[in-house]
Amino acid sequence: MDSKDESSHVWPTSAEHEQNAAQVHFVPDTGTVAQIVYTDDQVRPPQQVVYTADGASYTSVDGPEHTLVYIHPVEAAQTLFTDPGQVAYVQQDATAQQASLPVHNQVLPSIESVDGSDPLATLQTPLGRLEAKEEEDEDEDEDTEEDEEEDGEDTDLDDWEPDPPRPFDPHDLWCEECNNAHASVCPKHGPLHPIPNRPVLTRARASLPLVLYIDRFLGGVFSKRRIPKRTQFGPVEGPLVRGSELKDCYIHLKVSLDKGDRKERDLHEDLWFELSDETLCNWMMFVRPAQNHLEQNLVAYQYGHHVYYTTIKNVEPKQELKVWYAASYAEFVNQKIHDISEEERKVLREQEKNWPCYECNRRFISSEQLQQHLNSHDEKLDVFSRTRGRGRGRGKRRFGPGRRPGRPPKFIRLEITSENGEKSDDGTQDLLHFPTKEQFDEAEPATLNGLDQPEQTTIPIPQLPQETQSSLEHEPETHTLHLQPQHEESVVPTQSTLTADDMRRAKRIRLELQNAALQHLFIRKSFRPFKCLQCGKAFREKDKLDQHLRFHGREGNCPLTCDLCNKGFISSTSLESHMKLHSDQKTYSCIFCPESFDRLDLLKDHVAIHINDGYFTCPTCKKRFPDFIQVKKHVRSFHSEKIYQCTECDKAFCRPDKLRLHMLRHSDRKDFLCSTCGKQFKRKDKLREHMQRMHNPEREAKKADRISRSKTFKPRITSTDYDSFTFKCRLCMMGFRRRGMLVNHLSKRHPDMKIEEVPELTLPIIKPNRDYFCQYCDKVYKSASKRKAHILKNHPGAELPPSIRKLRPAGPGEPDPMLSTHTQLTGTIATPPVCCPHCSKQYSSKTKMVQHIRKKHPEFAQLSNTIHTPLTTAVISATPAVLTTDSATGETVVTTDLLTQAMTELSQTLTTDYRTPQGDYQRIQYIPVSQSASGLQQPQHIQLQVVQVASATSPHQSQQSTVDVGQLHDPQPYPQHAIQVQHIQVSGQPLSPSAQQAQQGLSPSHIQGSSSTQGQALQQQQQQQQNSSVQHTYLPSAWNSFRGYSSEIQMMTLPPGQFVITDSGVATPVTTGQVKAVTSGHYVLSESQSELEEKQTSALSGGVQVEPPAHSDSLDPQTNSQQQTTQYIITTTTNGNGSSEVHITKP
């Protein structure tokens, strides 16, 4: 594959541009931005090419067309390569001269003026023509637009006449177009487009912590969540004034000053916080003082030079913070602390009881007291729950019908009659326990669940302890318990043997429990210390009393008044409930008949007449239900009129809550996240359904035990369509449209194939670079997700822009749907593919690769040394090989150029993240090309080098980029070097590869670098074998993706393992007549080799002999103990004296 075809996949070009010329302008300020302006007849926007200083990215602004900048030295001028067929030479003074020459990806001859004049002078003419032509076109367009605007204005406002100039008046609105002021809106140019300022909170409101909020109507600071005891707030901030300068505020706080502070301020008294200005104080000015010790939950005190508030009890959510002074601080401010009354002490004691008893609703301070109390329940009677009909289908109710959590249990009467029908002396029994709802009994199918029944309800049957039942077996006199149900046919007689002593004992226990519960309820419910003197109504909080006094009475004081009876109300909800009494509309309708009622209790009494054989019958489908709640729910769900219509689709619902739930389908918000797989859902029930279906234990176990079966491979395309695809598998003769499809194919079918063997997968990924604008403000983001988060946070309720992936193509006459996305294409970015070190998968970002490793290779995710850090070095080959001739002067062979250098840095950046890890051996083939007037010549020598990738400790730290701004103007200072052969000798390392050595490879501490020159032999130095390292051996991977340029670089990775490298050099000439002497070395690489080969050849010209290295004898003891395997022999040939070295620079 030649370079033109390969680059066209990355940089798409058009065939019609082959003969077009272009002018290039370099921006003098930066030196890294080049603007390409085409000079042909076609009208095309200019292209701006950015080549960053660190070589990290490439950007083209013109959209679908791409332009890549290559810089090449040609005798004091740089060549800029754009699309094929467009070449411009950039001179040292940042000016350009156009040229229409075909590009063969080789070194081009320098520009010479035909008449011998300065080439810079010929440049100014086309540039001047182009600029003049552009100015003329702009002037014509402006004149045309101005004429059209004037014609439109004349037709719209023919009768308008300008007003005479008005004197300055602050109430007039200035119009710049009219150069005059107007009383209101300008009659010609219309109103202005105002953009208001953002509202800025005061300092006091802006400093409010996130766990607190200020009530907008009542004032005061309230808690959003539970705040534990001993939580400190503060310090209080505000101006300090004297006591005589204090203004009205919630609480007065005094600050004690030291003697030094008083002398500085020239004061003779302490200062007070003035907490009345929101712009000077913080949020603590809104905390109101407590009126008694019961409502106090904060204490104020001074610590150092500041005043703090600390919670003295747990603050519950939606509870107001109330503060008062500490004991010592109260004396300092001449205030008294709140005294605790006996009733308040009882309430506080009850609040401190955090250990509840679930048998009798009592609470205790410690777990020991609760355990002692639970022991007393062993002697009490247990009550069986009576059986009832099925409920609403949501499981068993915990607190019985009609009782909400937190409400006291109901008292149920139990009548006990003897066998002869007479009532016993015990009369009625009060039970604190209320039964739980169970299944309906067959004898009692229908109940008015949820309705108030006028008759006495069915009574549960008590059960005595086992010891009591055993004692009753010897008693002759027994009693029979009879229930008093609502209907006589549903009486359930239950026989139980109870003596009179047992019944009296049970009654005494129940009375004790009842008295304890009543006392507990009195303390919590009936303590109302704040009473209204006008009507006698009492409240538990002073704020409630103040609110009641503010709207006391019926005339004039209440904000809301009934128009019919002049009754006053303090809330709209109370007024709406009251207005139902004056309306003729019956709110509560019976589902079985046309009757309607204005009160719910009347409806509850009415529906009992519709019971037929113990069941309620649906009036529409004749389905029977044993419970009224069930039939009511059935009618409302299936037979109600669907009056709530969805505005997005054709669905309708009978209830507004169902419509709100359905509207989540049309929204973009997904607030429910699956913690297992990360999938998001709009509704909680869908998340629950996903968890049950996808992440249940049975499915996970079946998925883990599933055996992967290989499917038979069937090619999907014919061989004729194979060449039309960009990404191809050459083993299967199969083509793919996208890179990811080829990667997935290789991972499944060819897992042993390496990425370096597939040229298509080494190409960079071209991704569009977009700006995402917020249509509600001036924010710009680089991703749609960040813009979406910004809109949801700062513009709640605003409509989100549509996603680019969900846009449908515009029809005829329709606007471009991309206009509604509020995005703009700013160019493209070439990013390197990031390869997984454990499989053939590759991704566009390192983040996705890390996620892949955590999911597919969890055993490697925990090992920090598995993921190798990419090398930060590159080989910049920039020294020419000097061909030594018989004459004194040497002819320089141009072995590299700035084009290759720029491509080196670009590929260095593109291949940073998937470079070969340490321990792999690579071969680099370097083919230099010489420059002459007759054109290109054949390569004069070839160098091969085998190196190991390792870190370097270079004494000279180079700059970040080797393509500098100054080199664009003057390429001469940049040195050029040729690759120097590095002969590597091995220290005393055992040749038998172990399992650990096979993983680590040849360590840099076991090899030593040296240079081979003419007439020298490699000598072993035993004292330098330890702690030695190899430098100048850094090579980037995947150079085969940039073939066909003037300097071709190819890579080959040898199989991993423990290798032994030896050298034996001979002097062999390559050509005759020009080369005086050439050094040739043979590298023998063997895996687990027992004996090192030594090869010596005689020089064909010059008779120079290079002796074998001396370190081979030290490795002889292990000759007979190892088994010889495959060998890799690579010949290295060097022209010249071999004195130059490879320069290693960091990008």
Curated annotation (Swiss-Prot):
Annotated region (C-terminal glutamine-rich region), positions in chain: 901-1127
Annotated disease: Birt-Hogg-Dube syndrome 2: A form of Birt-Hogg-Dube syndrome, a rare genodermatosis usually manifesting in adulthood and characterized by multiple fibrofolliculomas, trichodiscomas, and acrochordons. Patients with this syndrome have an increased susceptibility to develop renal cell carcinoma, lung cysts, and spontaneous pneumothorax. BHD2 inheritance is autosomal dominant.
Biased composition (Basic and acidic residues): 472-490
Source species of the chain: Homo sapiens (Human)
Protein name: PR domain zinc finger protein 10
Family: Belongs to the class V-like SAM-binding methyltransferase superfamily.
Region (Disordered): 1-20, 110-168, 387-412, 466-499, 953-973, 988-1031, 1088-1147
Tagged with keyword Transferase: no
Cross-link (Glycyl lysine isopeptide (Lys-Gly) (interchain with G-Cter in SUMO2)): 380
Any single Pfam family the record assigns to this protein: zf-C2H2
Record's comment describing the protein's domains: The SET domain is degenerated, suggesting that it has lost methyltransferase activity.
Biased composition (Low complexity): 1118-1140
Compartments it resides in: Nucleus
Span of zinc fingers (C2H2-type): 355-377, 530-552, 560-582, 588-610, 616-639, 644-666, 672-695, 727-750, 772-795, 834-857
InterPro entries per the UniProt record, alphabetical: PRDM10_PR/SET, SET_dom, SET_dom_sf, Zinc_finger/UBP_domain, Znf_C2H2_sf, Znf_C2H2_type
Compositionally biased region (Basic residues): 387-407
Record field: transmembrane: none
Sequence ranges assigned to domain SET in this UniProt record: 208-326
Biased composition range(s): Polar residues: 953-964
GO cellular component: chromatin; nucleus; transcription repressor complex
Phosphothreonine modified-residue sites: 428
